[in-house]
Curated annotation (Swiss-Prot):
Record's protein name: Sodium channel protein type 1 subunit alpha
Chain positions of II repeats: 750-1022
Species per Swiss-Prot/TrEMBL record: Rattus norvegicus
UniProt biased composition (Basic and acidic residues): 28-48, 507-528, 593-607, 1988-2009
Keyword Glycoprotein: yes
Catalysed conversion reaction: Na(+)(in) = Na(+)(out)
Keyword field: Cell membrane, Disulfide bond, Glycoprotein, Ion channel, Ion transport, Membrane, Phosphoprotein, Repeat, Sodium, Sodium channel, Sodium transport, Transmembrane, Transmembrane helix, Transport, Voltage-gated channel
Amino acid sequence: MEQTVLVPPGPDSFNFFTRESLAAIERRIAEEKAKNPKPDKKDDDENGPKPNSDLEAGKNLPFIYGDIPPEMVSEPLEDLDPYYINKKTFIVLNKGKAIFRFSATSALYILTPFNPLRKIAIKILVHSLFSMLIMCTILTNCVFMTMSNPPDWTKNVEYTFTGIYTFESLIKIIARGFCLEDFTFLRDPWNWLDFTVITFAYVTEFVDLGNVSALRTFRVLRALKTISVIPGLKTIVGALIQSVKKLSDVMILTVFCLSVFALIGLQLFMGNLRNKCVQWPPTNASLEEHSIEKNVTTDYNGTLVNETVFEFDWKSYIQDSRYHYFLEGVLDALLCGNSSDAGQCPEGYMCVKAGRNPNYGYTSFDTFSWAFLSLFRLMTQDFWENLYQLTLRAAGKTYMIFFVLVIFLGSFYLINLILAVVAMAYEEQNQATLEEAEQKEAEFQQMLEQLKKQQEAAQQAAAATASEHSREPSAAGRLSDSSSEASKLSSKSAKERRNRRKKRKQKEQSGGEEKDDDEFHKSESEDSIRRKGFRFSIEGNRLTYEKRYSSPHQSLLSIRGSLFSPRRNSRTSLFSFRGRAKDVGSENDFADDEHSTFEDNESRRDSLFVPRRHGERRNSNLSQTSRSSRMLAGLPANGKMHSTVDCNGVVSLVGGPSVPTSPVGQLLPEVIIDKPATDDNGTTTETEMRKRRSSSFHVSMDFLEDPSQRQRAMSIASILTNTVEELEESRQKCPPCWYKFSNIFLIWDCSPYWLKVKHIVNLVVMDPFVDLAITICIVLNTLFMAMEHYPMTEHFNHVLTVGNLVFTGIFTAEMFLKIIAMDPYYYFQEGWNIFDGFIVTLSLVELGLANVEGLSVLRSFRLLRVFKLAKSWPTLNMLIKIIGNSVGALGNLTLVLAIIVFIFAVVGMQLFGKSYKDCVCKIATDCKLPRWHMNDFFHSFLIVFRVLCGEWIETMWDCMEVAGQAMCLTVFMMVMVIRNLVVLNLFLALLLSSFSADNLAATDDDNEMNNLQIAVDRMHKGVAYVKRKIYEFIQQSFVRKQKILDEIKPLDDLNNRKDNCTSNHTTEIGKDLDCLKDVNGTTSGIGTGSSVEKYIIDESDYMSFINNPSLTVTVPIAVGESDFENLNTEDFSSESDLEESKEKLNESSSSSEGSTVDIGAPAEEQPVMEPEETLEPEACFTEGCVQRFKCCQISVEEGRGKQWWNLRRTCFRIVEHNWFETFIVFMILLSSGALAFEDIYIDQRKTIKTMLEYADKVFTYIFILEMLLKWVAYGYQTYFTNAWCWLDFLIVDVSLVSLTANALGYSELGAIKSLRTLRALRPLRALSRFEGMRVVVNALLGAIPSIMNVLLVCLIFWLIFSIMGVNLFAGKFYHCVNTTTGDTFEITEVNNHSDCLKLIERNETARWKNVKVNFDNVGFGYLSLLQVATFKGWMDIMYAAVDSRNVELQPKYEESLYMYLYFVIFIIFGSFFTLNLFIGVIIDNFNQQKKKFGGQDIFMTEEQKKYYNAMKKLGSKKPQKPIPRPGNKFQGMVFDFVTRQVFDISIMILICLNMVTMMVETDDQSDYVTSILSRINLVFIVLFTGECVLKLISLRHYYFTIGWNIFDFVVVILSIVGMFLAELIEKYFVSPTLFRVIRLARIGRILRLIKGAKGIRTLLFALMMSLPALFNIGLLLFLVMFIYAIFGMSNFAYVKREVGIDDMFNFETFGNSMICLFQITTSAGWDGLLAPILNSKPPDCDPNKVNPGSSVKGDCGNPSVGIFFFVSYIIISFLVVVNMYIAVILENFSVATEESAEPLSEDDFEMFYEVWEKFDPDATQFMEFEKLSQFAAALEPPLNLPQPNKLQLIAMDLPMVSGDRIHCLDILFAFTKRVLGESGEMDALRIQMEERFMASNPSKVSYQPITTTLKRKQEEVSAVIIQRAYRRHLLKRTVKQASFTYNKNKLKGGANLLVKEDMIIDRINENSITEKTDLTMSTAACPPSYDRVTKPIVEKHEQEGKDEKAKGK
């Protein structure tokens, strides 16, 4: 991080912005221009300074700057951000310290920054009241907009609003300027909105533009202005827009997939949905009506006669809807189909294509656009069961396959991909926030350093007084300003956080403490407590600490000293430090913090806190041996120091027993001091010092090393404390007089007698048992409330009323006693108490108002008592916290959502309200407004809310019918898209932020052991004690031998202790049981000799601790290591056994220092493995059995025993044989298959029935035989300890029982019949036999505990809504119906129950009946809520609720309209939150399990992973032999043409065009269009045939070696055949056009060529990766469906056909059952299937109805079985399957994105080999060195090396074989290494990869490299140098000789010649120097040598190489 320029913080940094400042800025700008006339913009953006993110406009001023001097508020100041130092800007700060940045240029060219008008405008603009005014205006405006027909006077109000907005804009424009400079009005996009709104307001006023209501909708945008006014919302909207960008790839993929599916749908179902059942033959009346008169001239024997003939008009007849067959109460005619498995018409009707499509004609596949809409609806799963049923009815049941594909691939996959992308985006955003926080922390530390330097002197001056202050509470506030300044800064934000928390938790939660009187008088005010201690709190960013730094190994062990502590429960804990002379390598200064080393987590650096970790124990209630221990100098002398860590991870060291152990403060475990084991001079090494520096703010040795340092530490601490107090006093929420008042009136401690009373009451009320009793009362009270039902007897009602009174009394008493015990002031300091008080008050108010009508709602508040359970139930607590957190965290998002809902509701009302009123007859037969309309704001809001719930299609049909298609589609689609983004974002954010692994795992150790656990613990101890006493008594009376007793005693002690500690996961330190470790990590022996004293800190230790820092500390070991809980103490037969097991314990203890569980032993966490396959059977019986019954012990050495043993071994071999297993699996499948035949028609098929009966017997015998064999082979012990065997055993038992019953003739008994249905479980046996399914099941079983926990919490949560529903609606859903028409009577005819009874007496057609799913009791309430939560069947429940009036009264249309809100609230909290919570839990769980069984990559660095993955891909590929180019010239030309990329791409374009022509087809196109399309199709067929022929010519027989080519060939052949035989094929097979659709798959090939499609490739890659896992889940789902289908057939085959059950969708046959179950897998339409099953008695059904062809009578259902069947199926399929689906996809998506982010991907290697093929046509795997340069240039990035690349290639040092050839892998390795960078760890991986390559390519020529490119170059260079040196030598010689002779001859010219000689030699030297540089360059570029691929032992091969060379020559 580059050093940020730090402005001196504090008030000195503010300067007024004056004319001089402006001049200075201008001067700087001029200087910069002079220096740098042409600024390079791009460069500046990349590397230049960036604006400081903390000083952005709109943010608050960082607190480091201190307070703004009052005279500077709202005045122009110089810019603080160094970035703007040479830009013309200034800032203004308002009272709230918000930063406003303005341009310093003249606004509107006339107003300079110093103009008084502009100054006033700025003051107004920055004032908080201004934004408040605007906010209020907007809200009022919104209220006016919701009026559907506003009165006339509102017109004037409109003008007022417009005026205010105009005023606002003018102020902004005057203050900021209009648009030219930065920070002017129009530079802010939010102001565009204002501008548009105002412009429109004036335009519509003065210009008449026609449709006013459409324009009025523009005013709605004003609501969006709220976003620009509230600061937090802008960022949220920004984030949403970002996530939309991220989603672009998924959107494209989704649209593409939908188009493909829509095309398939278009081809398959075009026109099918118009098939109707038309009456045929027509009746006489209809014949006459549809006859046309025709004048025909006929020739009678030559005479022409004119006749009128009546001809039947077929077309008009079939279009007449009167002759269509309608089911009663349905708007559309019944569909039918002409294939055998489609819907059939009743007698007297025939199936004809006529009339319009269903649902006003909007549901169809007739054109591409409607098909697309249908598919989109399928994907969003809205009312898709309707589409599914219509299509299957019209086309046939086989087409279920189409829906399965679309639902699984389209719906689940794509929608979850959107989820995955949003989750990733969110995760990245979080990461960014974290990094930013870390950076802030670092910057903050820098600033602190600066402050420290400035204030060092002041601090030293204050040191003397400071040490007094820490002892004298009254001396607060005498410090010098500067030092208080420092600490103010350093602790302010932490204080802010603490103050925020203080609202809730100010005092200690005194529950469960038995205190001595002197220990803590409540009367001491908090200030005095605070002054007794000192706290360090340094700014830490909340986010950083609370998030993900947990490791599974980090549970600290707390030691409970019950045996020797005077006060067991006082919790103390201690910091202690260890001198590091001996073990420098240790990880950091806290011995117990091994796994979260501060050095790793940047964010934690320099802040003194101990991180809270997952699984940490917070209660170390170690005994306190002495109260008056001596402390560090300057610490309070009243006792030990506590260190508490608050929820932000800030450590506070707090003095003495007067500490409030608040539930938030987390106590650190006791850390124990050993006498120093190091040399006493306390030397520290240099690395140690460095470590200290890096974590300077831990309480580390620095503080304790020498006295002066220590003194300073203390003084700093006290300075901090005092300032903290001042700060708190200055920040107290109320004026001081209130505090005085509360001290006098709210703290009651006037008389000592009262104090005694108080003390006694305190002892009673705070006792854990009282808490337990209260909890039991809460549960009972909840039960009482849940027992209300309708109709209730008087007596029962009375019991409930009395019960309520009693409970109210109990809770009131509890409250008053607590107030007495704690004083009102402290009582109301705690959240739970306030909550209790609120509820109690409400209950009392309710009792007072019991008889007032209409206040029954108050009763619902009693339900809140259920939440008191959260106090002692961690998961519920967590859920409430999560909901609380997320409501907080998502406050802004929720607000955005609310604004959006509001806007759309108003838009809908303005646009469509009028249409709904005018065209209502189109959608309602009685011309009354339907329930869902947009005529007023409330209904409009409900429609938008319903769309947000995902139910948009039905309301959209209505809207399209009344208001036109285009507008409705636009509005609804917008709501849908925004819904998906925002709602998904919302809930994902919620889940991800609230669900870090710690949340779930840390549930069991919340804050401290809660009172319930303490109470239960005591009960356990009591029971154990009583047991022991009885046992001892028995021993003494009956057993004389004292010896036995002696042995038993220690065991019981141990047992007893074990009970004590295991409940709390802690190991006890007993007199003879110290399971603690000393420094070396060994466990001390557990003899009686070792004493505990060693571990308890002696008083004198404190001093030695200070004077000699080289102390060692022993830390409690972690839970994982204490195997004491796991020792089976019952098995100890004697002392020696005990010793042995303790030794075992020692061995198994961890050897890691300071300890957490050893990483090396993952055995504890691995799944239970199947027993290994030994060839010897195991023992038959357990050892217990053998000891009891001696007869079970047989010697296997001789006689019968030996025969028995041999028999067992034979059986064992049989059972273990593969064939046996295969045979059994085959039998299981057959017997399961047999069950599918037992349907409604079995009685008519006698032969099949007989066969099945015999088969059943055979199967049963086989399975019994298998079971017996396994018993003999494995023995009972092994067989019955395996869960899968138990499953087999139980299923065999069921068959056996029913077989026996049949033989005895009891087959008709009810019990036996119901047993027979259990045969449906047979397929479960297949589970253990199929690996894939078993994996899924195991994963699920792992998730069950947490799923159950959440399920329970959800049930509690729903219970509240259910009881509330019972209170609101019980008995009010009854209504009087006309049984003939099914209509409800109007209120005018029937007002109440008695009226209805009178009607019934008069005629039989009326009936007083209830809605089937209602709120008459809590059970039905749950069912209703489930229907509401799944949005299936919720309409009827809601309508009934909204119409209800009172018990026994006839309902009236929308009487209690606002009951809708009950459902809205439930959907938000009950449905969205809880269901998403499930998804969260499941995903979280899978992640945890993955971590648990995590693969090898946990132990790899990121770099290694990248390299490893690259290599992994490498190893699997090998160069393919390309198709040889044909020798023939013509063929060769064609070959070149066909293999070019352009050819491929043009074919792709043709495919796409072909698709477009297919899209154009419609069902009712004219013959002309049909003929044109068929011609176009002909052209395409010709073109594709041409492609096929060309490829065949050029590729010859190689054409058929490529899969795609075969596919193309088949499609072409089919198309040609299809042209001629179209009629025939369509009649018998699928339309041939379908094959063309499959061609679209070829587009997948083109994706590789497009650079931009990387994202889409990643998504498809993720799909490919998820397929195996998804297949397993699918298999499991099929199994579940199969079992449920069988079960459904045996139970519901004969129910009455109504609502969702009809002739096609029923449980009569296996196929139909599967069709129904597939539909409810997505919970679609389950209410319809359940409704008929709820009929249990006449008149709803007829129990005596005869079913033809079967002996079963009646068509009644079994409600309890039905409800269980559907609810369990929905839970299993929804939770399990759908969520596992999500987990798998999220997982693979993240893997895929990681892969795509890697520097080298699969595609790069493919590209390498594709290019390779061109250079190595014969696939020799070698390439000549000359070609290498071209090859490297031909590759694409990142592997390519652009030319000139000779030197780089030489530098790569590639091994060459004879003929200067290089192997492809060597090249690829070298290039890969170049991309990934060098790393020393790669060699091992590399060898691995080479081995893998050798294995996969046995063809690899084993070759012997002779040399390498570098060596070759070096050889060449050496040769050249030698040559040149020799030549030079020769030249010199000749020159010398010549000159010598010459000299002889001509001495005169000698000098001249010498000069020449020198010149020549220089010239030569120059040449050789260039050669040298060449050489140095090539070696310089050379990274460490690249070894060969098959790297043999180098020396050996070099020798061999030389020999070969010699041979070669």
